């Protein structure tokens, strides 16, 4: 190695996306390098492992045509950063934050490390207030709160991407506060890539959205940096400009598969299902960047979307994500088969922070008791449906038939809203219309004061 130029001529070996170098003193973990190929073409890389004077470099672009013996590697002394500015809103970028829309790069206001700055836990404020997604099964029953991280658990083939795009197009904060969306897609096939952009343009929301798109044909290494670049952009918008930022990440399963691919290339001892043992820690470095900071007006809210391999809720990806995040929205294959969209199964779904965003001063005073009653009746209706499959609906009693009808109407009218935007007021009114078909004694979870206030309101 030339100690003046910090240049290494000739690499020791290459394995997949990794380049191994010998005799590299004073290298730093996370340091960026430039790799010059025999034909003069340059690639970028990052040091991800140090073992004495031997280093492993993660090549950030395609490695095809890279001959190790003829490569020239220069250590830059820099770490991975992203040039950020408010001008990133309305732009389409690749997974590393480079423009792909044919326009010049936004003028940088700052250059920030993509791994984020450590946040003092004593400065964190608890999530509060409501983000309206326009999706009844989320807003009404699993309310999303500013500063929360609420993942969507999907099965292969379900319209999770469509739902993610719908949330980007419809989401808003109430009260006129400044709001923006950062959308990051990892491993997106061209069809989805094009569909996302078309949906955002058609809905007229691209000007308030920063779009990071890592395509399926892009190197897996880029996939590991995409959510970090997106969150770095979100942190700048939230904590430097005071915006409430919703970050939608899809698909985190593609991210985890790229993490596994790199770990195997490094000959690491695999953990569950071949994923690296540090995957929990790695996911936490992404999910825990959501939140609010005391004394700062902005916030970051995350909606990561992931596909459960083999529809398995105990698979390491959803399992570990569930430990870090604050609830989950679960998509159902059964509802999808019956033509219900979005196919959100509200029974296993949960927003642990719903109480911080629903109720008086945030949505409506009747929100929580109404949601509790709808949950309880729908759960009983599902039980009756299973019983009817055994004994036949003709053998059900009058109360069971009412519950069965309620469950069907709940899925059809409240959950199955289609692509239309539905405000929280419309969602709650839809819930009350469903309850109006039931006798008063069935509404045991709604306090008498709420029922009386509702009755008086209906008389006006």
Curated annotation (Swiss-Prot):
Pfam families to which the protein is assigned, alphabetical: ATP-synt_ab, ATP-synt_ab_N, ATP-synt_VA_C
Gene Ontology MF, one: proton-transporting ATP synthase activity, rotational mechanism
Domain of life assignment: Bacteria
CDD domains reported in the protein's UniProt record: ATP-synt_V_A-type_beta_N (cd18118), V_A-ATPase_B (cd01135)
Keywords attached to this entry: ATP synthesis, Hydrogen ion transport, Ion transport, Transport
GO biological process, one term: proton motive force-driven plasma membrane ATP synthesis
HAMAP family from the UniProt entry: ATP_synth_B_arch
Family the UniProt entry places it in: Belongs to the ATPase alpha/beta chains family.
Role played: Produces ATP from ADP in the presence of a proton gradient across the membrane. The V-type beta chain is a regulatory subunit.
NCBIfam families assigned: PRK04196.1
The name this protein goes by in its record: V-type ATP synthase beta chain
Lineage: Bacteria, Pseudomonadati, Myxococcota, Myxococcia, Myxococcales
């Amino acid at each position: 190695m030339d100690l003046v130029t910090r240049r290494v001529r000739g690499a020791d070996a290459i394995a997949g996306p990794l380049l191994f170098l010998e005799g590299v003193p004073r290298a730093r973990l996370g340091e960026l390098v430039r790799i010059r190929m025999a034909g003069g073409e340059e690639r970028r890389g990052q040091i991800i492992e140090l073992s004495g004077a031997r280093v492993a470099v993660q090549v950030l672009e395609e490695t095809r045509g890279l001959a190790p013996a003829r490569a020239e590697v220069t250590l830059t002394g820099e770490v991975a950063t992203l040039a950020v500015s408010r001008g990133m809103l309305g732009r389409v970028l690749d997974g590393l934050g480079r423009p792909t829309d044919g326009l010049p790069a936004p003028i940088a206001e700052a250059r920030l490390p993509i791994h984020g700055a450590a946040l003092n836990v004593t400065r964190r404020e608890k999530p509060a207030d409501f983000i309206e997604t326009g999706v009844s099964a989320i807003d009404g029953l699993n309310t999303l709160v500013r500063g929360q991280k609420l993942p969507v658990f999907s099965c292969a083939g379900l319209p999770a991407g469509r739902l993610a795009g719908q949330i980007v197009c419809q989401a808003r904060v109430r009260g006129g506060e400044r709001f923006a969306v950062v959308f990051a897609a990892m491993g997106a096939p061209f069809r989805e890539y094009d569909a996302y952009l078309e949906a955002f343009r058609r809905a007229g929301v691209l000007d308030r959205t920063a779009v990071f798109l890592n395509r399926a044909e892009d190197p897996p290494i880029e996939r590991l940096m995409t959510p970090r670049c997106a969150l770095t952009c979100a942190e700048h918008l939230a904590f430097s400009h005071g915006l409430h930022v919703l970050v939608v990440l899809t698909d985190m399963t593609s991210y985890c598969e790229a993490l596994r691919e790199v770990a195997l290339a490094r000959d690491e001892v695999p953990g569950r299902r071949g994923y690296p043992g540090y995957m929990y820690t790695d996911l936490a470095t992404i999910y825990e960047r959501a939140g609010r900071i005391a004394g700062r007006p902005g916030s970051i809210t995350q909606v990561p979307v992931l596909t459960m391999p083999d529809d398995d809720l105990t698979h390491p990806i959803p399992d570990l994500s569930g430990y870090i995040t604050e609830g989950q929205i679960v998509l159902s294959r059964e509802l999808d088969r019956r033509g219900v969209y979005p196919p959100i199964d509200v029974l296993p779904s949960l927003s642990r922070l719903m109480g911080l965003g629903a109720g008086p001063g945030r949505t409506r005073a009747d929100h929580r008791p109404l949601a509790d009653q709808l949950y309880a009746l729908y759960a009983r209706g599902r039980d009756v449906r299973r019983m009817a499959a055994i004994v036949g609906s003709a053998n059900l009693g009058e109360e069971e038939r009412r519950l069965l009808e309620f469950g069907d109407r709940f899925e059809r009218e409240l959950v199955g809203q289609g692509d239309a935007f539905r405000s929280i007021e419309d969602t709650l009114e839809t819930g009350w219309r469903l309850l109006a078909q039931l006798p008063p004694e069935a509404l045991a979870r709604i306090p008498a004061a709420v029922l009386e206030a509702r009755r008086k309101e209906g008389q006006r």
